[in-house]
């Protein structure tokens, strides 16, 4: 209730301006274990039925915060206190970049969706590593999302991903290669069999940590399956589906540029994930993201084959109680259907 009133004021302000103010507060809170413990006492939720061991990592629950919120890995401790089972920091690039011109973050309030054209704005890998290490270790697994610098030509993309990975080798529990943001020119062109294979072969030689590929929801199904297969054969441990969409028909008044996320993406993301799971469930770890805002949708994605979930836009629209609400209701749903734990639910629709 309190957040609903607060949100009315915040939503009168520029979206990126609000995000920056919230980030400043979260950075300050991250400095204090006391305040982080208070946040967790109020907004966290722990239940052994939600725990899982995946790729050697212990996840207290399957609900993660997607990349893009904490671009510089500077407020992880405060964010995880809100009840997330894990968090993905970034996107970090090899060198700092300011991103695209403002305004570049927009709300579609009626659709409970966001449109962002940020462009991987971040302080660069060196400062990202420094920020991460300041409060490490963390209580949950932390992924590092890696992207290509805007000024790097396609022919040099592999070397650029290698450079940013090298700088980040000592931080994080897993890495996600982001080839699917619509806000870096031609980045999505790298979503092809040859490049994906080279990328994961290279990364596999550099680290034993789990590696993920994040894919776009706008790929043709056959192309998506082909690229996914190429990634897995080259050493990818999992697939994150999906990033934002450029399908502007999903909202009433779209802006010219930027990817859409939130409730408008629910159906599209679910359809892509369903095809992905049909082909690759039990062959790799599948992470579902896109339009998840309540326990019912979370439960459906897990039954479809998702070992893990990620949210972003729903956190903006629903506020700090979101994780707790989803997780409590998720336990009720799995118990109602006779499951003893979330582990038993994964892929139930495919059995």
UniProtKB/Swiss-Prot annotation:
It is found in: Cell membrane. Its EC number is 1.3.5.2. It catalyses: (S)-dihydroorotate + a quinone = orotate + a quinol. Its cofactor is FMN. Transmembrane segments: none annotated. Binds 1 FMN per subunit. GO terms for biological process: 'de novo' pyrimidine nucleobase biosynthetic process; 'de novo' UMP biosynthetic process. GO terms for molecular function: dihydroorotate dehydrogenase (quinone) activity. One of its GO terms (cellular component) is cytoplasm. FMN binds at residues 67-71, 91, 145, 178, 214, 242, 262, 291, 312-313. Substrate binds at residues 71, 116-120, 178, 183, 243-244. It holds the Pfam family DHO_dh. It is a peripheral membrane protein. Pathway: Pyrimidine metabolism; UMP biosynthesis via de novo pathway; orotate from (S)-dihydroorotate (quinone route): step 1/1. It comes from the Bacteria. Keywords: Cell membrane, Flavoprotein, FMN, Membrane, Oxidoreductase, Pyrimidine biosynthesis. The active site is at residue 181. Monomer. Belongs to the dihydroorotate dehydrogenase family. Type 2 subfamily. NCBIfam families: PRK05286.2-2, PRK05286.2-5, pyrD_sub2. Catalyzes the conversion of dihydroorotate to orotate with quinone as electron acceptor. This is Dihydroorotate dehydrogenase (quinone). It comes from Helicobacter acinonychis (strain Sheeba). The lineage of its organism: Bacteria, Pseudomonadati, Campylobacterota, Epsilonproteobacteria, Campylobacterales.
